Swiss-Prot record:
Lineage: Eukaryota, Metazoa, Chordata, Craniata, Vertebrata
Tissue spec. comment: Expressed in testis.
Additional detail: The gene encoding this protein appears to have arisen by SVA-mediated retrotransposition of the SLC35G6 gene in the primate lineage.
GO cellular component: membrane
Origin superkingdom: Eukaryota
EamA domain mapped to chain residues: 49-174, 272-325
Organism: Homo sapiens
UniProt record similarity statement: Belongs to the SLC35G solute transporter family.
Region named Disordered: 1-24
Positions of transmembrane segments: 37-57, 67-87, 105-125, 160-180, 185-205, 221-241, 250-270, 281-301, 305-325
Subcellular location: Membrane
Gene this protein is translated from: SLC35G3
Protein name (Swiss-Prot/TrEMBL): Solute carrier family 35 member G3
Keyword annotations of the record: Membrane, Repeat, Transmembrane, Transmembrane helix
Signal sequence extent: none
Membrane topology: Multi-pass membrane protein
Length: 338
């Protein structure tokens, strides 16, 4: 009998259990970022950081060639059209399947409205302030709309991070509100802040509508429709409301090209992130755009950055750290038997 063999009856001390895996390997196998964490990291690195360059570069193009906001929107939409080739190669319909086509068009329309408001706002208010108002309003609206429409709540740490982002918004925008008493300039400043707020509201609605689209080529379809809808709406408006202006120098052309590429990268990363994490958390992490915009506002546009702006940037970064730390989770691949 195998159980009576001397080999099996030896004391346990002479035959210890096999050595465990190296600690580093076990940690790597046991701890993996959750889907929410992966989405937030993509939103931070691929969505917020590239988007922080868009506002200052748009301002530079406007200052160099007086490039109207509608024309800048047209150039940006042109970068979305080549996605049609990808859809054709995959054999997917350009306008989406019939059951989701109306929602996909509505999502694209909201995206264009959000971009248009952002471009208009950045021409009359500082780039960092415009980005802060837009991202702050999108964060608040996303939290409220998701809670009301999807009944998807947030943890206490998440709410703490959201409130920190809103505090950063108030610190940045608060001093600028005093300019509303300076006649015509104050009126334009107020309109710029209103446009930035409406841009954030449209962004939050777009993210919620996008989350409701469930079909494989969702992201490239919405990206192509955004370019198509933007061109159909902007080209007639450009000739009616503004005079077309071609970029006059290499700097303007470089800014236009960089805006188109960076904006498309940001759009793609945000579209991926919002399917993995709560829309309000994605919008909060996108506040990293504000920090980048403030840095570029000082070094590239040579615009004054107030001490309150620096404090607000620190508050925003701290809030993003809280949200990210809360969503960092370790998924165990196995349990240790006692």
């Amino acid at each position: 009998m195998a159980g009576s063999h001397p080999y099996f009856n030896q004391p346990d001390s002479t035959h210890p259990s096999p050595p465990s895996a190296p600690p580093s390997l076990r940690w790597y196998q046991r701890c993996q970022p959750s889907d929410a964490t992966s989405g937030l990291l993509v939103a931070l690195l691929g969505g917020g950081l590239p988007a922080g360059f868009v506002g200052p570069l748009s301002r530079m193009a406007y200052q160099a060639s007086n490039l109207p906001s509608l024309e800048l929107l047209i150039w940006r939409c042109l970068f979305h059209l080549p996605i049609a080739l990808l859809l054709k190669l995959r054999g997917d319909p350009l306008l989406g399947t019939p059951d989701i086509r109306s929602r996909a068009f509505f999502c694209a329309l909201l995206n264009i409205l959000s971009i248009g408001c952002a471009y208009s706002a950045v021409q009359v208010v500082p780039a960092g302030n415009a980005a802060t108002v837009r991202k702050g309003s999108s964060t608040v609206c996303s939290a409220v709309l998701t809670l009301c429409l999807e009944s998807q709540g947030l943890s206490g740490y998440d709410w703490c991070g959201l409130l920190g982002c809103i505090l950063g918004l108030i610190i940045i925008v608060g001093p600028g509100l005093w300019t509303l008493q300076e006649g015509t300039t104050g009126v334009y400043t107020a309109l710029g802040y209103v446009e930035a707020f409406l841009g954030g509201l449209a962004l939050s609605l777009r993210l919620l509508v996008y989350r409701s689209l469930h079909f494989p080529p969702c992201l490239p379809t919405v990206a192509f429709l955004s370019g198509l809808v933007g061109l159909l709406g902007s080209v007639p408006g450009l000739f009616v409301l503004q005079a077309p202006v071609l970029p006059s120098d290499l700097l303007s052309w470089s800014c236009v090209g960089a805006v188109g590429i960076l904006a498309l990268v940001s759009f793609t990363c945000v579209g991926y992130a919002v399917t993995k994490a709560h829309p309000a958390l994605v919008c909060a992490v996108l506040h990293s755009e504000v920090v980048v915009a403030l840095i570029l506002q000082y070094y590239m546009l040579h615009e004054t950055v107030a001490p309150s702006d620096i404090v607000a940037a620190g508050v925003v970064l701290g809030s993003i750290a809280i949200i990210t730390a809360q969503n960092l989770s370790c998924e165990r691949t196995g349990r240790v038997e006692e």
